[in-house]
From Swiss-Prot:
Pfam families: ACBP (PF00887). The modification Phosphotyrosine is found at Y29. This is Acyl-CoA-binding protein. The keyword Transport applies. The modification N6-acetyllysine is found at K8, K19, K51, K55, K77. It comes from the Eukaryota. Binds medium- and long-chain acyl-CoA esters with very high affinity and may function as an intracellular carrier of acyl-CoA esters. The modification N6-malonyllysine is found at K55. Keywords: Acetylation, Endoplasmic reticulum, Golgi apparatus, Hydroxylation, Lipid-binding, Phosphoprotein, Transport. SUPFAM superfamilies: Acyl-CoA binding protein (SSF47027).
Length: 87
């Protein structure tokens, strides 16, 4: 697993033939943020921002996960989604 593989997966996920399910998108989002930013560094969105809260919660669950582990999980998930949805 390398930065190049991660970057490639980040581009490929944008080209899936079908948009993944919400839970799959949250997985992709949270692992991307953990790999690129690290532990969450923002306040939780307000109570009416349901989408923002879901994304924040998913990322927050990865607190303490290393960049390398987040990248590997992200790449593995993109490979799974490519098989499921096509590219």
């Amino acid at each position: 697993m390398s930065q190049a593989e991660f970057d490639k997966a980040a581009e490929e996920v944008k080209n899936l033939k079908t948009k993944p399910a919400d839970d799959e998108m949250l997985f992709i989002y949270s692992h991307y943020k953990q790999a690129t930013v690290g532990d969450i560094n923002t306040e939780r969105p307000g109570m009416l921002d349901f989408k923002g809260k879901a994304k924040w919660d998913a990322w927050n669950q990865l607190k303490g996960t290393s960049k390398e582990d987040a990248m590997k999980s992200y790449i593995d998930k993109v490979e799974e989604l490519k098989k499921k949805y096509g590219i």
